[in-house]
Amino acid sequence: MQFKTFALAATLLAALTAPLAPVAAQVKEHTFKVGIGLSDDHPQAQAVRHFAERLQAKSGGKMNAKLFASGALGNDVSMTSALRGGTLEMTIPDSSTLMSLIKPFGVLNLPLTFNTEAEADALLDGPFGQKLLAMLPDKGLIGLGFWENGFRHVTNSRRAINTAEDLAGLKLRVIQSPLFLDTFNALGTNATPMPFTELYTAMEQKAVDGQENPPATILASKFYEVQKHLVLSRHMYSAWVLLMSKKTWDGLSADEKKIVQEAAREATVFERKTIRAFSETALGELKKAGMQITELPAAEQAKLRTKLQPVLAKYGKEFGEETTSEMMGELAKARGGK
């Protein structure tokens, strides 16, 4: 009886493991370098480590991802270029980095467009977001999903921002993008394009008065050490794009690609959950660190929208009127047709 039980168990084990054998045979050793500009303790970095864990679990330890944080491999622009050239495997730039390569990506950064994280998820995970990702291979990139950066807010070292007019004259670092330049110049600031990796030092040395980023980045990057004032302006929603070099992707087997895609999907869920939890506590931590936080009243938000109408009109056309209209239609659906 014991022998029969053992034989039955062995047969079941063989049946369970047999389907895995062909997959294992098609999975080779891979370690993907992942470069990011943010710090090692930022939620984005935590999500990269989660991605690495899922890769290892799904590949029997054969596939892995190695994180290089704090701009060790360059800024978003240079790392994205490295992916296209095949000298770096992965990076996670702000979607605005891609608009110089593919103009329709710019619609995601149109100011005052998104209201909630939920509608951003619906847009990016739905047909519209997938259509954008499908444009990447022609530029030597593979899009594995959209991660959340969050709603952006303005900080500065000079004064509290209580009205739209209070922004006037501030020298603010912005992402190296014409859209960001025009957005903040329209609001009366002196917009200064600069790589994120240079930002802390620039604020410390008073080369710029301030910057704009989501709370998680402000806290993790310790901007509270060199910035006194934070206004919850919610002027723009910001998404990251999880990218792999097409040259790397093309060198993977079908089984390896499936593992990467599955790990990326799981890491996307993890990243959004992690950064939202982190952001909920970030404002309290920033207050404890000495930052003075203000919120623009609805009337002042309306003033921002009025000032930005020419920017919205200009870039709505530049990024493609059809694309812009499609995005707004999808957002209307996400809002229940409101």
Which positions does each model-derived feature cover?
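N-terminal secretory/targeting leader peptides
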Residues: 26-119, 127-338
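Short, low-complexity disordered leader/linker segments with a strong preference
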Residues: 1-31, 336-338
